[in-house]
Amino acid sequence: MAEKDATASGDDAIRVSGMQFAYEVEDPIFFDFNLDLPAGSRCLLVGANGSGKTTLLKILAGKHMVGGKNVVQVLSRSAFHDTQLVCSGDLSYLGGSWSKTVGSAGEVPLQGDFSAEHMIFGVEGTDPVRREKLIDLLDINLQWRMHKVSDGQKRRVQICMGLLHPFKVLLLDEVTVDLDVVARMDLLEFFKEECDQRGATIVYATHIFDGLETWATHLAYIQDGELNRLSKMTDIEELKTSPNLLSVVESWLRSEIKLVKKKKKPVAPWKPSPFDNSPFRSSRHMAYYR
């Protein structure tokens, strides 16, 4: 059961009520999941790998249908059914890298000999002043050729394009992982201004906690598909005695790992089979997957 503060109200920017979700032929990821975030908040979404953070963000972004129209609401509208949320730019999602799935090779980076200018100026209906501000903020060279630049430079262009339209709710999934420290801190300051000046709401999933103690207003901790904790940053008792947020989250995750190990059933020892040396049981060379 999550520890919640008293911020839930009719003015919530995000409201999830009794959500259940599972991928096809798999066990449920979320069961009776609830989340309420007020407008203007900056919420850190933390948890171990595989806890459900990315899936939750995609559900909030309207990429997965769950339950009825009132189960997942963003700005008092159905995240999945109200497509105008995304089309208008009110709801924006930034996550993952520019990649495509190619056969059994998995995901590979998108390739294309086009400039950053071509991509950024190709987004229609944008404010030129906001566009120039983002280009300057992210230190983007409009002459960059996108098939030649680094992952961090590609990420800057991706972020710029995703922020060109003023958002009301922004969902971020590890978008700063490729950025250097200066670009990351400048971007976080921009997000803070968007919340303070325009009342925007941000949910930010990350494993990099430097400088976030004073940036975030709320923290949501997901443990194995459950909302273990939801509280204001000022109400987290551990932060008052710990040197930083990293130490606090680390202690939570280590406790979680110990609990999982206690519940884990012992694995039966491997026994050789007479068929192991059979030519019909050979495996592909690992180079196939490189």
From Swiss-Prot:
This is ABC transporter I family member 19. Keywords: ATP-binding, Cytoplasm, Nucleotide-binding, Transport. One of its GO terms (molecular function) is ATP binding. Residues 14-249 form the ABC transporter domain. Signal peptide: none annotated. Belongs to the ABC transporter superfamily. ABCI family. Its main location: cytoplasm. Pfam families: ABC_tran. PANTHER family: SKFA PEPTIDE EXPORT ATP-BINDING PROTEIN SKFE. Induction: By sucrose. ATP binds at residues 47-54. It is found in: Cytoplasm. PROSITE patterns: ABC_TRANSPORTER_2 (PS50893). GO terms for cellular component: cytoplasm.
